[in-house]
Amino acid sequence: WIHTAKSLGAKYAVLVAKHCSGFSLWPTTAHEYSIKNSPYKNGKGDIVAEFVASCRKYGIKPGIYASTTANGFLHVDNPGLVKKGSPVTQEEYNKIVETQLTELWSNYGKLFEIWFDGGVLSQQNGGADILTLIQRLQPNSIAFQGPYGYPNLIRWVGNEEGNSPYPCWATADATTSADGVQKIKGLYGNPHGNYWCPG
């Protein structure tokens, strides 16, 4: 796939390492719902490692998508809050998030882009300490809908068709850049904003 992406002129690629179901494409130590308990390579596979190796082989910058706001396996729903009936507490889920992000951001080298998709639950609102982790482990990566206060954010433009509103300013203010998520009124950015946060 990366060879094909390269032949099409791609400069970077993003792998969905963990979507909202909670299944992890790497052998995470955080829980058992991962590739290590699948028949792929007799439980010894690591698709994230294979993806990153292929990116490096073909000169493509690797990125990783890992949803933290939803996890069907652990009964966690957007914006990252544990639901009634979950096998884990909020504190335990936050530890799982921090463990998994540490694994992804420590074990596979420099990442060009990190996708959160759906934003992140801030620590002030009961979420994991994602800002400290990303600043320590991947300080140069750009982050789609990343934590408030991270300087390299890119933001949602309000739809999944790729059509941005007009005008769409590449700067934003504290209100329109929070968690990288744009409320409907903030989809345009802010021409006088202090934050570089393109959509």
Cite the ranges covered by each PLM segment:
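Mature catalytic domains of secreted/periplasmic carbohydrate-active enzymes
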Residues: 1-199
